[in-house]
Design a protein with these regions (language model features):
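Short, hydrophobic/aliphatic alpha-helical segments
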Residues: 33-40, 120-139, 145, 269-278, ...
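Mobile "lid/hinge" segments at catalytic clefts and subdomain interfaces of large enzymes
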Residues: 146, 153-169
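Glycine-rich nucleotide/cofactor/substrate-binding loop typically near the N-terminus or early
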Residues: 51-122
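Non-catalytic interaction/clamp surfaces of large macromolecular machines
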Residues: 163-164, 168-229
Length: 620
């Protein structure tokens, strides 16, 4: 049987409508007094309830109680306040419709031209871990009813659901002799229905979480925030970023125009440094490129050879702030790959950090905040186009994550586990693990949590010194990361530190020249260009020289975002150094072919971090 579809109800066709009566009922009272003052100034009668009415009267404004308007008192502990024909009749009446006008007159119903409301804070109540009964009590009934009535009749009535709309509302009214336009009413109605959908979705999801059965269909409502020039590629237009309705963005844009990949980098990089800070108590930084870290580090003092390799004087290094120290380590883990990076710093960015970042080629930064001096320095980068994002304080992401791919939506619980020293309590070996090693293991775990899978990383002295990301084979991850470890260490070799560059060779060119010197596999034409960097062309760095230097490598931890299915990855890792005491750290406990009876391979102890499986694979 076909459903009965209602016919349209006709009335007057009006663009600008000046409100004669507005109903105000808000839990978030931000800006409400100012808005009520304006409405009162244009002769609009104010109706309200409870705390909102009291707030308006405190400002010296006349406000009529809803109960007085309806001649029906609130009842049932306030559960019934506005569910009354004099409220919904006033909202739903079609102006100029003869039957509606007669019904209103017969029932003593006056028009209500505007509703300003917020819904009960259901999500906030749930987020606090409140009892089920309290959560149920914070499900709004009257609010959504008024919202839908007002939005349905948007041809004549205006629905306002957020303080963020107040400025647009008053600007429009001031430009139209105190009236709202049809275009604004329609736009606000769309926002209202989206708000209602998100609200009901959160209630449905919460109730589903209280059941043993699987969750019902979930509704997700997105609020466009920033248009983007294009997506991953120039042909992918239009593009933009949206917030999830009811939740703020995790950052604000302070300067510049971020792109699609910039924002992906920022979102992942910020989570990485925030978790590192929480887990270790140290300032943390990362250097991101294409949604994976090129480097990540903690504020651990630099050695003399590191200072030379990073082109920082020991005097300057001694006065570095934690933020600067962490970023200098992160940037110099793999400075060739960090060219044009997106930086993230867990702490406030100070002047010293900004001055260091100013001389590097970088696309942008996200941080906890900025001193005024640092902000002015960074705003000068890239001719004023340097991207500066400030993380939203105390932002809590939703517990569920969704991703749309090829017409499908994937969902999963957010990986909210933050690795800490508590996860390092059990070891297969009997060796004592000192705090510095645990610190580096935590660094490795959290870094790989935000690295494209498969991924393997090596850490040393509070710094990731080699990250192998996005390989199909785990042993290839080890090989890739291992090459980066060798390059990092050999950058501190006396022959490399002694390279005599010509005056005027740029910093990044010096970085690249050192890396190519270590690699040594030049084409004829490339060698000519490379030699042009030096006052005196250096002697080759021979394989024997490199091998002898690498034998001194020790204290390096190995992290993996999942278990090693074969021992070949560990075998290859052991080739990087012969000194015992290196740590191979795995992301889960599982019997596998690489495990030896003594709990180690080639002198590398294997530490199991958890009793239960814990993997941090990231696939975009």
């Amino acid at each position: 049987m076909a459903p009965h579809i209602l016919s349209a109800v006709t009335g007057n066709s009006v663009d600008v409508i000046k409100p004669v009566r507005a109903l105000i009922s808000v839990s978030d009272k931000t800006g409400i007094v100012e808005l009520a003052t304006y409405l009162s100034s244009i002769g609009c009668e104010l109706l309200s309830t409870g705390g909102t009415a009291a707030k308006i009267r405190e400002a010296g404004l006349v406000c009529k109680d809803v109960a007085e308007h309806t001649k029906s008192p609130e009842c049932l502990d306030g559960r019934v306040k506005t569910l009354h024909p004099k409220i919904h009749g006033g909202l739903l009446a079609v102006r100029g419709n003869e039957k509606h006008e007669k019904d209103m007159k017969d029932n003593d119903i006056g028009v209500i031209d505007m509703t300003i409301l917020n819904l009960y804070p259901f999500e906030a109540t749930v987020a606090k871990g409140s009892p089920f009964e309290m959560c149920v009590e914070n499900i709004d009934i009257g609010g959504p009813s008024m919202l839908r009535s007002t939005a349905k009749n948007h041809a004549y009535t205006t629905i306002v659901t957020s303080p963020s709309q107040y400025a647009e509302l008053t600007d429009t009214m001031k430009s139209n002799e105190g009236g709202t336009t049809l275009a604004l009413r329609k736009r606000f109605a769309a926002r209202a229905y989206a708000t209602s959908a998100a609200y009901d979705s959160s209630i449905a999801s919460y109730f589903a979480s209280q059941l043993d059965s699987e969750a019902p269909v979930a509704a997700r409502v997105y609020q466009p925030e920033y248009p983007l020039k294009y997506g991953c590629n120039p042909q992918q237009k239009p593009a933009g970023i949206s917030s999830i309705l009811g939740s703020p963005l995790p950052f604000s844009v302070v300067n510049g125009k971020p792109g699609y990949i910039n924002l992906l980098d920022a979102a992942n990089a910020w989570q990485l440094v925030k978790e590192l800070k929480e887990a270790t108590g140290l300032a943390a930084a990362t250097s991101f490129k294409h949604v994976s870290p090129a480097g990540a580090a903690l504020a651990v003092p630099l050695s003399s050879s590191e200072c030379q390799a990073f082109e920082i004087s020991e005097t300057d290094a001694a006065s570095l702030t934690p933020s600067a120290l962490a970023y200098i380590r992160a940037r110099n883990a793999d400075p060739m790959c960090s060219f044009g990076d997106f930086a993230a710093i867990s702490d406030i960015v100070d002047e010293g950090t900004a001055l260091y970042l100013k001389k590097e080629v970088s696309d942008g930064i996200i941080a906890a905040g900025y001193t005024p001096e640092a902000l002015e320095i960074l705003k000068q980068k890239k001719k004023g186009n340097f991207i500066i994002l400030e993380a939203t304080p105390d932002f809590v992401p939703p517990s569920m994550e969704y991703r749309e791919v090829f017409g499908m939506a994937f969902s999963q619980k957010r990986n909210s586990i933050i690795v800490s020293a508590d996860h390092m309590k059990e070891s297969v070996t009997k060796r004592t693990v000192d705090d510095d090693v645990k610190r580096d293991m935590i660094l490795g775990c959290i870094t790989l949590k935000y690295t494209q899978s498969n991924s393997v990383g090596f850490g040393k002295n509070g710094q990731m010194v080699g990250i192998g990301a996005g390989q199909q084979s785990r042993v290839d991850c080890v090989k890739l990361a291992g090459r980066k470890v060798a390059t990092f260490m050999l950058r501190q070799h006396p022959q490399v530190l002694g390279l005599n560059f010509k005056a005027g060779v740029k910093r990044q060119d010096r970085v690249n020249a050192r890396v190519r010197y270590i690699e040594g596999d030049f084409t004829t034409e490339e060698r000519v260009r490379w030699e042009a960097n030096f006052e005196v062309v250096p002697e080759p760095l021979t394989s024997d020289t490199k091998e002898a230097y690498m034998k001194e490598l020790s204290g390096v931890i190995l992290s993996s975002d999942a278990f090693f299915p074969f021992r070949d990855g560990i075998d290859h890792a052991s080739k990087l150094a012969t000194k015992r005491g290196n740590i191979a750290e795995r992301m889960q406990q599982r019997a596998h072919p690489s495990r030896e009876e003594d709990g180690g391979i080639n002198g590398i102890p294997i530490l199991f971090r958890m009793r239960h499986f814990l993997e941090f694979k990231v696939i975009w």
